[in-house]
């Protein structure tokens, strides 16, 4: 399987090698209905974003703020995950002369108070980078992040509804903060009806709110509800990072369960003081991860839903002081 990582992108708003810029109080759309000959699910459909932010030839792009934006009806390519493609998507691209400019990266990023509705593929993504080769392995040191990754990233008070794929994701960031966000009914296009011509692409997976290759990411006071069924489809996913903490979050009726600890490079992760209400399929997915701590959570569980999702186990975890309550006692 392959990922598409180059091609044409249509962006309603584009910040290219910008610094100390605030985009605020706009309504933004980028639909595909007027493009002759382009079908919704075609494999080579143009990528589209509401707001694209790109770092390339100016080194560290600092001080990007996206605040109080209403972004809707962005009809991107449902298959492509590694390009600017969705409601808000920030990427670092390979510089023309890295020795002269320094690595392309972001620092001091704030995405706050935005409403994203019917956007595809991603809802809100911060930080995909050309420099991913510097983040291999499970244990991650600070040094690669300080040179190639992203610093001081905050994603707060955003609402993502009906994203075609993933809801909210932060990538390649050192100690990012993701708080008070909602992912509602995301992954609504990761199904056989819409995701119908992927070719040899990987990626028929999507989840609610999660990090990729971050160190010490903190997710708190978020809500993920009604994530639609696919190979993942859980509310939260500690994916291939070091030291992710989920605390004081709420999840409800996500069709793939509450939380996944994803694969061999997901280490030192903690899931504590969260509430899961009627998550489906299986409450947790410890998917070949070396370790995880699941402590002091409350799980309201429907009859017949297992704690570990079938065919999503094989990993290691420690469960301490969790409360399990049968859902039938709390529904009319």
Describe every region a protein language model picked out.
Residues 1-2, 328-332:
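Short, intrinsically disordered, charge-balanced linker/junction segments flanking boundaries
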Residues 1-22, 32-62, 80-98, 102-103:
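Extracellular beta-strand-rich solenoid/capping regions of secreted or surface-exposed proteins
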Residues 7, 203-204:
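Extracytoplasmic loops and strand-loop junctions of Gram-negative outer membrane beta-barrel proteins
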Residues 12, 34-35, 48-52, 77-78, ...:
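Structural detector of coil-to-beta-strand junctions
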Residues 15, 28, 53, 90, ...:
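Extracellular beta-strand solenoids
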Residues 15, 43, 58, 80, ...:
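Residue-level marker of regulatory loop/turn positions in helix-turn-helix DNA-binding domains and
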Residues 19-30, 59-75, 98-122, 134-166, ...:
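Right-handed parallel beta-helix
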Residues 94, 128-130, 174:
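Active-site-proximal loop/turn and secondary-structure-junction residues that shape catalytic pockets
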